Each structure stands twice: as structure tokens, then as C-alpha cells.
């Protein structure tokens, strides 16, 4: 008897994802989402920002796929997971649950090497790591490599203790210039 109200609530919450629901065409039928043969995966979620219900579900699907591939598959080849413009997804918007994404990034940075994998994020500024809360600290402590391009906020990143550069190294970093349309320094 106690399961009936729970089942009704579950059915109500899933109605938009059923065959006739607003998002049904994304989830009904054979799945075409397969990253098992991909060595390089970019999580590009920009189009979903305006649809928080769909955003949360797709993030769960992607996290599940990445987890399966990275942690549970054979370790015979390396894997690389890159989250582009990651900071925009760490800024909560109406209805978005970012805890799963933050946890996946955090666990990825902590555990991926053990499974011949690596995790990366692309940010506009090192200071964007402050948006990540505790996950930002995990990223700082576990990122083996950083690619730092031209930026105007490196002094602020030093003040925020995100970067520990000073003197010549900081001056050298601040001297990096973009040389469009060619490759940069």
C-alpha cells in the first residue's frame, strides 16, 4: 500500500520523459549515445542550459557513461575527459542540480590516473576555480598539467592563492600573447 503513492509520484516526475512527453524523443528508442570507442570525450552542454529538467537528466546520463567507461572498462587504452567552459556549469541556475557534475569532476581528478585516464577543464580565468567550491581545491591539488594562455587576471589568481607564481615566472606568464590566426606562444 505504501508503494502506490511513491509510484504515482515517480510516474508524475517522469511524465516529460515518456514517449509522449516533452523530452520523450531524446530517450525512447535505441540509445545512440556510446563513448566506448572514443579516446577523447568533450562534455559540451551549452544548449541544455536553458532546459534545466533536461540538463539534469543528460548530466546523469553522461556521468554514468563516463563512469562506466573510465572506471569499469578495460584499462588497455588511455581515456581523456575534458569539460569545456566548465565554470558556467558551476554557477547554479533555476532548477539545475550541479552536485552530480561537481562530484564527477572531483572524482575524475582524484581517480582517473589509476584507470589510465585523465580529466581536464577549460576555463576563461584561473579565478573561475573559486566557483567550484571544494571541487576547485581538488582540481588545484590533482591537476598534473596546466596550460595557461594569455590572460589579464593572473595577479588576482596569485592573490587568491590559486597560483603560487611570483617574480620572473609570473612576469613570463603575463607576457604570453595570442597571435591570431596563428598558434599562440
Where are each of the predicted segments found?
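Conserved ATP-driven motor cores of ASCE-family P-loop NTPases powering translocation/secretion/packaging/pilus
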Residues: 93, 97-102, 106-185
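P-loop NTPase motor domains
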Residues: 1-117, 178
Amino acid at each position: 500500500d505504501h508503494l502506490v503513492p511513491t509510484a504515482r509520484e515517480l510516474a508524475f516526475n517522469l511524465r516529460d520523459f515518456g514517449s509522449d512527453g516533452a523530452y520523450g524523443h531524446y530517450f525512447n528508442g535505441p540509445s545512440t549515445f556510446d563513448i566506448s570507442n572514443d579516446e577523447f570525450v568533450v562534455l559540451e552542454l551549452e544548449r541544455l542550459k536553458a532546459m534545466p529538467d533536461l540538463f539534469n537528466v543528460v548530466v546523469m546520463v553522461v556521468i554514468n557513461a563516463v563512469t562506466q567507461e573510465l572506471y569499469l572498462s578495460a584499462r588497455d587504452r588511455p581515456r581523456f575527459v575534458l569539460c569545456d567552459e566548465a565554470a558556467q556549469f558551476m554557477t547554479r541556475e533555476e532548477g539545475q542540480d550541479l552536485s552530480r557534475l561537481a562530484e564527477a569532476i572531483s572524482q575524475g581528478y582524484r581517480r582517473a590516473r589509476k584507470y589510465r585516464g585523465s580529466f581536464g577543464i577549460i576555463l576563461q580565468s584561473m579565478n573561475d576555480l573559486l566557483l567550484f567550491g571544494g571541487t576547485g581545491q581538488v582540481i588545484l591539488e590533482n591537476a598534473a598539467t596546466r596550460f595557461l594562455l594569455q590572460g589579464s587576471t593572473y595577479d588576482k589568481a596569485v592573490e587568491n592563492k590559486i597560483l603560487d607564481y611570483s617574480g620572473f615566472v609570473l612576469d613570463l606568464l603575463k607576457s604570453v600573447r595570442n597571435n591570431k590566426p596563428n598558434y599562440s606562444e
